[in-house]
Amino acid sequence: MLCLGIEGTAEKTGVGIVDEAGNVLSLRGKPLIPEKGGIHPREAAEHHAKWIPRLIAEACRDAGVELGEIGLISFSRGPGLGPALRTVATAARTLALSLDVPIVGVNHCIGHIEIGRLTTGASDPVSLYVSGGNTQVIAFNEGRYRVFGETLDIAVGNMLDQFARESGLGHPGGPVIEQLALKASEYIELPYSVKGMDISFSGLLTAALRKMEAGASLEDLAYSIQETAFSMLVEVTERALAYTEKNQVLLCGGVAVNRRLRDMLREMCQEHHVEFHMPPPEYCGDNGAMIAWLGQLVYKYRGPDALEDTTVVQRYRTDEVDVPWMRESEAGIELPPDILAKGAEANIYRGQWIGRPCIIKERISKGYRIPEIDQKLRSSRTRREARLINQAKGAGVHTPVLFDVDPDGGVMVMEEVRGTPFRDAVEDTELCSRIGEAIGRLHHAGIIHGDLTGSNIIIRGGDVVFIDFGLGRFSDEIEDMGVDLLVLKKSLESTHYALAGECFSRVLEGYGKIIDADIQSKIREIESRGRYTD
């Protein structure tokens, strides 16, 4: 059976034809290039209405098939621009009715992952999905693709486009910035904002525009924007990789064509001894083939949609969709024998300190980061982590005993905390409440952990011990407290979806015994700023 897929979530119209075996028979597309400014939803819809019929005819001709040989119609149901989505859905319904064939609406983001898996052979990767409208770190768990991290404000592609527009470089901004960066002479420091596995680009964009207004060269700014933003992207992917212990990384989405980002991610994968995958460039941007292939999968495992169920969903979350064709791989990361564990930031070794067993945490230099970013992060995070660990003890929170710290070398020597990671004990509701109280004590003391995941909370005997304060900081702002707790919530949802709701409710219950602020409202407010969250 042949499936014809129609893509049009934003400014690119795409049509593809794919058979049941995953052979791409044709791929046609037409982007909208605005004369000035960004993409207007109405103009995108008009563009799709004009080009969908033409591209369908061209795709059939390329595939050597008649339109009547198409057995299934698939279309992007969301997420995306409302007018654009509705135009695509109307075209898909009309075509399905006229051909008297079934129709399925599919998730655009999952389409990128599935065409990536199809074309690269990746089986169960951590996916970094980067485009104009989306920035997510995604991995499969418990029947769905879970979002382990994402932008808290604007997508990386949107950030690049906005800078290009404001600086007169035109649209799309990514390719122009990539070329300008090759001519740079120096790095200009810009905000580096990683919060657990989430990231923020708005501060980076604002700072870059101010530097431009102050006279900084566009070449240096282009280079600095890329190095800062892409280092953040690779770091959060690295964090998800360490957390999930998967052995593959897939780069997908329109920004994936950037050579510098590809090289940085490949370097990180080599450091972690895992596979790196990226689809061919023609499948990175929005395209009809990814929609057609996902349509084949959805139809095979779920069947067709009723016509009344083909409405569009502008804020269609990746983690709303069951993916019954996926299976979690049992393969994991194989580390060299001398490394006890490898986190996103550091290698962990066992050692001896004046005759006592200890853990050596070494923040190794990251080959994917330029020295100006790498050295600053390694030394500043080491200094800050040591202070946070010690001050947390003063707040009545258990943390490892520090034996020695070398900030310039990025090395910390501390006791080994042996116990059960919280991720393996989330069903214990009383424990969840006690963890909430401990987080409350940290926040009451002005300590933000920065990476509250189930791996960084250890249950040792009857004690709750917090480790890895590498992303921590000192703050008494309720915004930072909310983000800290949101990191924990998303970590729970990513790996224990069925238990996450009850567990996090108990965490907040315990937290409320220490902190009187309306933290739940703050968390909901922060969540509402994210991409495609209700």
UniProtKB/Swiss-Prot annotation:
Binding site for Fe cation: H108, H112, Y129, D286
Keyword Cytoplasm among UniProt keywords: yes
Cofactor note: Binds 1 Fe(2+) ion per subunit.
Sites where the protein binds L-threonylcarbamoyladenylate: Y129, V130, S131, G132, G133, D161, G174, E178, N258
BP GO terms, sorted: tRNA threonylcarbamoyladenosine modification
Catalytic activity: L-seryl-[protein] + ATP = O-phospho-L-seryl-[protein] + ADP + H(+); L-threonyl-[protein] + ATP = O-phospho-L-threonyl-[protein] + ADP + H(+); L-threonylcarbamoyladenylate + adenosine(37) in tRNA = N(6)-L-threonylcarbamoyladenosine(37) in tRNA + AMP + H(+)
Entry annotated with the keyword tRNA processing: yes
Keyword annotations of the record: Acyltransferase, ATP-binding, Cytoplasm, Iron, Kinase, Metal-binding, Multifunctional enzyme, Nucleotide-binding, Serine/threonine-protein kinase, Transferase, tRNA processing
GO molecular function annotation: ATP binding; iron ion binding; metalloendopeptidase activity; N(6)-L-threonylcarbamoyladenine synthase activity; protein serine kinase activity; protein serine/threonine kinase activity; protein serine/threonine/tyrosine kinase activity; zinc ion binding
Source organism superkingdom: Archaea
EC number from the UniProt entry: 2.3.1.234, 2.7.11.1
Classification via SUPFAM superfamilies: Actin-like ATPase domain, Protein kinase-like (PK-like)
Residues that hold ATP according to the record: L340, A341, K342, G343, A344, E345, A346, N347, I348, K361
Cofactor(s) this protein requires: Fe(2+)
Compartment list: Cytoplasm
Gene Ontology cellular-component annotations: cytoplasm; EKC/KEOPS complex
Residues annotated as catalytic: D451
Annotated region described as Kae1, given as residue ranges: 1-325
Chief location category: cytoplasm
Domain Protein kinase: 335-534
Family the UniProt entry places it in: In the N-terminal section; belongs to the KAE1 / TsaD family. In the C-terminal section; belongs to the protein kinase superfamily. Tyr protein kinase family. BUD32 subfamily.
Complexes and interactors: Component of the KEOPS complex that consists of Kae1, Bud32, Cgi121 and Pcc1; the whole complex dimerizes.
Function: Required for the formation of a threonylcarbamoyl group on adenosine at position 37 (t(6)A37) in tRNAs that read codons beginning with adenine. Is a component of the KEOPS complex that is probably involved in the transfer of the threonylcarbamoyl moiety of threonylcarbamoyl-AMP (TC-AMP) to the N6 group of A37. The Kae1 domain likely plays a direct catalytic role in this reaction. The Bud32 domain probably displays kinase activity that regulates Kae1 function.
Name this polypeptide is given: Probable bifunctional tRNA threonylcarbamoyladenosine biosynthesis protein
Organism expressing this protein natively: Methanothermobacter thermautotrophicus (strain ATCC 29096 / DSM 1053 / JCM 10044 / NBRC 100330 / Delta H) (Methanobacterium thermoautotrophicum)
